[in-house]
């Protein structure tokens, strides 16, 4: 049976109600069974998020203790699939870098607002917080994975770049669907490592400016001198 109903997955109580409404006509399930299953899944999801954040903090502590460098490999959930990411995480660890996902450090970052875009998606918000946290820590860099098929990535890549460059940090973007050849990716990662080492060797001071976006407001006084197209 194929079913594709709308489900409010951000509301545990309402999610249980909707699942019961959709499943009970086809399956022998009671309301309490559905409610208990949703609650168990909810607890497991929270436990997963807590463990991810804890592992992120543990990895950051080890990086600093051992004097290593880390990469926040920021991508969508499907980029975790080895068939999609083409082994980029393993490539990075093979180069001596620790690899973290954006959701393992996002809870440590606070976004400088306002942003230039409308920040209305959970993944985007998590990505921007991870980028903001990266700007304040020289032992980690952010590499963003995007897929051409996802149009919203064009918005996130511009905003992440602005957040990083506002604090003088390097921005690296890898477009997953440009090919499965890791040779080009390996060259870019080696170049990034070389740039990091050169920056640290020179002890270059990063030029810092606010990452928040200053909107230009059209006032009545501007009416005589400007035209909105």
Regions found by a protein language model. Give the residues of each.
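An N-terminal assembly and electron-transfer interface module characteristic of large anaerobic redox
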Residues: 1-229
């Amino acid at each position: 049976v194929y079913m594709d109903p709308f489900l409010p997955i951000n509301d545990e109580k309402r999610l249980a109600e909707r699942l019961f409404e959709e499943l009970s006509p086809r399956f022998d399930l009671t309301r309490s069974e559905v409610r208990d299953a949703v609650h168990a899944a909810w607890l497991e999801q929270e436990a997963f998020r807590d463990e991810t954040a804890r592992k992120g903090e543990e990895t950051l502590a080890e990086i600093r203790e051992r004097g290593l460098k880390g990469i926040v490999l920021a991508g969508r959930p499907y980029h975790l699939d080895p068939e999609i990411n083409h082994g980029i995480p393993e490539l990075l660890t093979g180069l001596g870098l620790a690899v973290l996902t954006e959701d393992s450090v996002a809870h440590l970052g606070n976004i400088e607002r306002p942003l230039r875009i409308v920040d209305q998606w959970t993944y985007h918000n998590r990505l921007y917080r991870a980028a903001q946290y990266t700007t304040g820590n020289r032992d980690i860099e952010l590499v963003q994975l995007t897929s051409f098929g996802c149009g919203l990535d064009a918005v996130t890549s511009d905003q992440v770049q602005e957040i990083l460059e506002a604090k003088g940090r390097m921005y690296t973007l890898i477009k997953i669907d440009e090919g499965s050849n890791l040779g080009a990716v390996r060259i870019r990662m080696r170049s990034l490592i070389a740039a990091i080492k050169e920056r640290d060797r020179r002890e270059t001071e990063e030029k810092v400016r606010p990452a928040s976006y200053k909107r230009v407001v059209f006032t009545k006084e501007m009416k005589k001198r400007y035209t909105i197209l």
